[in-house]
């Protein structure tokens, strides 16, 4: 559970930390889209350099990014191997029964690997440099135009902020419950698949009870303080779009233009 970084924030004073969450969200969404424009080594090299620039500017240790990558290793390897084994290509370099590995399948597998890693790194930058409540405020502000069609933007923002706030708490509760069960002699690593599934039950039941208790306490606290959502509420911290946020958006626009031009030229 220590590898789960969602909802965790690393305090800092880097330029990435000081940016408006709306600009970081916009760049993150754009990055996920334009990564599919890259189809050769030069395109991925540009994306790698862009990501490395974000990592360096965030002034956060690379170990945090590697920790964020660990929970996804299984999915990444499965996808890469599947792509490598079942993608048809003209230049076959290995063949066994129905399995054929070609140069094209190897290249595609490497590209998919880079896509996963780069997206995870960029999302990790967003998570580690933006407090969860600030991130929720940014999403709420970004969804502001939807108020015109009666979408409850404030309520959605509140739900998101509460969810993000309690992710680290749930992770800590899970770790505490697992340690308590291990102290009672529970072994989560032995047995077949069915036994491993059954061993999760002693974790899930206390975790659900704890979660419902926390939710009830939060609801009572909000009611006792007279909380009322909707328009008219002000925020303690106001989001301010500054020149550095505009530069960040311009950088992703330039990256998009470069990838589009290169895809047409090549």
UniProtKB/Swiss-Prot annotation:
Single annotated GO MF: ATPase-coupled transmembrane transporter activity
Membrane topology of this protein: Multi-pass membrane protein
One Pfam short name: CbiQ
GO cellular component: plasma membrane
Keywords, sorted A to Z: Cell membrane, Membrane, Transmembrane, Transmembrane helix, Transport
Transmembrane segments: 29-49, 73-93, 106-126, 151-171, 246-266
InterPro entries from the UniProt entry: ABC/ECF_trnsptr_transmembrane, EcfT
Domain of life of the organism encoding this protein: Bacteria
Location relative to the cell: Cell membrane
Subunit structure: Forms a stable energy-coupling factor (ECF) transporter complex possibly composed of 2 membrane-embedded substrate-binding proteins (S component), 2 ATP-binding proteins (A component) and 2 transmembrane proteins (T component). In L.lactis forms a stable complex with EcfA' and EcfT and S components. In E.coli forms a stable complex with EcfA, EcfA' and individually with 3 tested S components (BioY, NiaX and ThiT) with a stoichiometry of 1:1:1:1. The core ECF complex interacts with a number of substrate-specific binding components, including BioY, BioY2, HmpT, NiaX, PanT, QueT, RibU and ThiT.
Family under the similarity heading: Belongs to the energy-coupling factor EcfT family.
Functional description taken from the UniProt entry: Part of a common energy-coupling factor (ECF) ABC-transporter complex. Unlike classic ABC transporters this ECF transporter provides the energy necessary to transport a number of different substrates. In this organism these probably include biotin, thiamine precursor, niacin, pantothenic acid, queuosine precursor, riboflavin and thiamine. Uptake of niacin or riboflavin into proteosomes containing EcfA1A2T and Niax or RibU has been demonstrated. Uptake requires hydrolyzable Mg-ATP and is substrate-specific; NiaX-containing proteosomes did not transport riboflavin.
Name of the protein in question: Energy-coupling factor transporter transmembrane protein EcfT
Organism the protein comes from: Lactococcus lactis subsp. cremoris (strain MG1363)
Source lineage: Bacteria, Bacillati, Bacillota, Bacilli, Lactobacillales
